[in-house]
């Protein structure tokens, strides 16, 4: 049995949710209604996020990148946590509902590209189009966009020990099939609503300390 860690990006690896930051800075007011429909599950994540990015003109590409480079902060302890999982031969994947044009640059030099799974974007038209290369498999009908539970099934064996780290509604389906969940913010609410056991965290020092205990138990 091997330990596999599947970690969200926006609001988990970064302190802020980069998609929401982009919308607040660059999207028109109607983005707020779409965001609320995603959080209430009135819109699927795939449909809602597609609608949000269709509100953003593609000629803002460079401005958005510059804005995120200046404002996005990596959560405390993340660099040390990555070193810890490497030293302990723990598989680590970023599974992000975020977009390639900001996830890759913000993780450059920290996580190899082949360990990052995120959505793709097309800037060839007037507004941003999202592409979904990691959509739901036959076991999921939730129109997740990037389907985290499907990726877990694809990347691991059923007898592996699955750890999910996340913060929001987009991590719920993955949390349902995890052996251990580290949760913060809105994911805590969703875990409690769905009776999913979780360990709360605010920094990756919290996660590392708990994972160290887990390794000692399993040794």
UniProtKB/Swiss-Prot annotation:
Q: Which UniProt keywords apply?
A: Amino-acid biosynthesis, Hydrolase, Methionine biosynthesis
Recorded catalytic reaction(s): these are: 2-hydroxy-5-methylsulfanyl-3-oxopent-1-enyl phosphate + H2O = 1,2-dihydroxy-5-(methylsulfanyl)pent-1-en-3-one + phosphate
Enzyme category, top tier: hydrolase
Lineage top rank: taxon? Bacteria
Pathway annotation from the record? Amino-acid biosynthesis; L-methionine biosynthesis via salvage pathway; L-methionine from S-methyl-5-thio-alpha-D-ribose 1-phosphate: step 4/6
Membrane spanning stretches? none
Gene3D superfamilies registered for this protein in UniProt: 3.90.1470.20, HAD superfamily/HAD-like
Task: Name the job this protein performs.
Answer: Dephosphorylates 2-hydroxy-3-keto-5-methylthiopentenyl-1-phosphate (HK-MTPenyl-1-P) yielding 1,2-dihydroxy-3-keto-5-methylthiopentene (DHK-MTPene).
Q: Which family does it belong to?
A: Belongs to the HAD-like hydrolase superfamily. MtnX family.
Q: What is this protein called?
A: 2-hydroxy-3-keto-5-methylthiopentenyl-1-phosphate phosphatase
Give the organism the record lists: Bacillus cereus (strain B4264)
**Gene that this sequence comes from:** mtnX
């Amino acid at each position: 049995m091997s330990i596999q860690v599947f970690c969200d990006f926006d609001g988990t690896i970064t302190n802020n949710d980069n998609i929401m930051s982009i919308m607040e800075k660059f999207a028109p007011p109607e983005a707020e209604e779409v965001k609320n429909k995603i959080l209430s599950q009135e819109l699927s994540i795939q449909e809602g996020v597609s609608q949000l990015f269709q509100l953003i003109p593609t000629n803002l590409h460079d401005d958005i990148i510059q804005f995120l480079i200046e404002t996005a902060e990596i959560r405390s302890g993340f660099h040390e946590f990555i070193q810890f999982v490497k030293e302990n031969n723990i598989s680590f994947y970023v599974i992000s509902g975020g977009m390639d044009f900001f996830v890759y640059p913000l993780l450059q030099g920290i996580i190899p590209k082949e360990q990052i799974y995120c959505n793709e974007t097309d800037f060839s038209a007037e507004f941003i189009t999202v592409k979904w290369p990691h959509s739901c498999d036959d076991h999921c009908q939730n129109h997740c966009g990037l389907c985290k539970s499907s990726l877990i099934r694809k990347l691991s064996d059923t007898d592996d020990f699955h750890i999910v780290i996340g913060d929001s509604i987009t991590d719920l389906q993955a949390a349902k099939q995890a052996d251990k969940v580290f949760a913060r913010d809105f994911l805590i609410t969703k875990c409690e609503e769905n009776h999913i056991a979780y360990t709360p965290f605010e920094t990756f020092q919290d996660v590392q300390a708990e994972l160290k205990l887990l390794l000692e138990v399993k040794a």
